[in-house]
């Protein structure tokens, strides 16, 4: 009796070496805005906190407004994050355990713990100033919130760079860039608030500081670009790469630096801050797009 022949599948020559076997996440504009709002909120808090602790006579008024604005951006950021997860309960489920070895768990807890002192710091700005104990409460809240704000700023970069997604897995400087960018965005936000509130001494100090931040931010950005240069070459044609470089380097660094250093017109200083934010958005969009270029 003739036996049926068994079909044996032959593995691909060379196996899976050099092959992409992951599926790109179904992320788009929402997660890009989530990353931007996270950077603005944490950066505003970090810059305002340091300014308020170092020179309250100069920055206290603008810092109070910055804490309230940072809380608003955090609420929008968390809403974007929850909608991006698809199920609002998923964020809640991540709070049931603490895994110090998991960037997702650490980041979720940092966001939660950051929101508490931020809320206190923002609330003290709207309560009656006659309450003398409020200043002490605000300072304690600021100090307590600093490490959690820093953790919230850095965790998304660490989370993406430890994934298996093409482009992200090579982005070892992503956490460093997002943290540096958050502080730069915070400086731009503080400068804008100081301008709108007529805080001349704060504006003078923040213009100088923001010029330094914009320049220093180019270092982690350059290291990040070096990490993901292969993925960028797959994601963009040459004209697209030049366009992205023009937006990020020209619009996000050179133009703002020029406006900050040689210009005294209030409107143009606001333009400098806006350019920094738009460049940050463009870079985050390019980061989110990297795995899709290899799928």
Q: What is the meaning of each model-derived region?
A:
Residues 75-80, 106, 183-184, 282-290:
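Juxtamembrane membrane-interface segments at transmembrane alpha-helix termini
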Residues 29, 34-40, 52-59, 63, ...:
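Long, contiguous internal "core" modules enriched in hydrophobic/ aromatic residues
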Residues 2-14, 80, 144-158:
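An acidic intrinsically disordered interaction segment
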Residues 82-87, 223-232, 286-295:
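A cytosolic-side transmembrane-helix exit/cap motif
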Residues 1-2, 278, 282, 286, ...:
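Sequence termini and other peripheral, non-core segments
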Residues 1-57, 290:
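N-terminal signal-anchor module of multipass membrane proteins
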Residues 44-110:
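Membrane helical hairpin/interfacial module
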